[in-house]
Amino acid sequence: MKKIYPNAYFNNVLEIKISFLIKNKIKALILDVDNTLIDYDKNLSEDIIKWSCELQGQGIKMYILSNTNKKEKVENVAKKLEIPYEYFAKKPLKKGFYKVQKELNLKPQNIGVVGDQIFTDIIGGNRCNMFTILVDPVDKKDFWYTAWKRPIENKLKAKIKEQK
């Protein structure tokens, strides 16, 4: 049951500050794309680009790990943020997380996994002993393969918010 709970919860990625990362000994972030960085219509905000630049400028490594099989979509976001990426990761399976960890050359506890889904991002990161950060979805609109899980995730998020 512990695997479904994140180490931290924020309304969005912009709330994740360098002071929080330093306090928690996080040297890198593994980022989800859909509804974490971009909305349903594939828009990446200037604020997120700026946030990414600021954190990278302060030594935080970043890497995209996405379940989408649409390489071009992930590649476009990665180029704008100037970070490496892996797509079609099959989260919550461990393989993609371990591959990124190896490339980052860091211990799992020094890597933060940031995503909007408990059943992929959070469980996957927790299974790999990484520091997990749950954020609310950027957009209310979801793809069909995500939408069915949201009511369950919303109940869990309510419990997480109570504990905050």
What are these regions (language model features)?
Residues 2-31, 42-43, 50-61, 65, ...:
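Asp-based, Mg2+/Mn2+-dependent phosphohydrolase catalytic module
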